[in-house]
């Protein structure tokens, strides 16, 4: 419990350093409704993981995992997240992606807030040895539950790309994101998030997910993610990536 109380303070002290050294993974969408006015407890966290293996004539495996931790104050929220996925077939790796990030939110009123978020991503099978993004701006909480929640936010940012061919690129960008959550029943929740990073090569991300609670701590998550890049690297020329995951989740 002492750790849960001290981590937010440490994040506040290290926030400036973290934003400068790393930067949200722009192939994912932050869908946690991190409004401190609606928080039921000072800390919320989850861990989701899924694994698929096949053997015989074809040998393949796929592993996905993600986690989000959020600490709430009276008018602030601090979040850390990470995700990982890799796939192999016949003992050869075909995809491998890792991302970590952090986010802060400050409520100016019950509906208006400021935010800042940053992350680091590596996805070498899609052409990115490293991608760092930092964004900050203004958001509006239009709906705040308990059944329906919706927020929209936007702001400027900067992105640094290091490609697998050795080239690098730094560019300014414009960021916008909308997230909707629908508490369908006591144990079933639907979420839809969309984010856009507008630059010379614009990226659009979407996550559609259904979470079903099994009990107080465990649940199932089905998610469909789409990432579209207007100008993908030459080493990974497809504009659109799609991923469907089914995972078991644990609530902290």
What are these regions (language model features)?
Residues 51-55, 73, 84-88, 120-124, ...:
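Transmembrane beta-strands of outer-membrane beta-barrel pores
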Residues 147-215, 219:
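Outer-membrane beta-barrel transmembrane domain signature
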Residues 43, 75-80, 111-114, 146-150, ...:
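Repeated loop/turn-to-beta-strand initiation elements of outer-membrane beta-barrel proteins
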Residues 47-51, 65-71, 102-106, 136-140, ...:
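Residues on the lipid-exposed face of transmembrane beta-strands in outer-membrane beta-barrel proteins
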Residues 71-75, 108-110, 139-144, 160-162, ...:
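Outer-membrane beta-barrel proteins
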Residues 53-61, 89-95, 122-130, 164-168, ...:
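Solvent-exposed loop/turn segments connecting transmembrane beta-strands
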Residues 47-49, 80-82, 116, 152-154, ...:
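Membrane-embedded beta-strand positions of outer-membrane beta-barrel proteins
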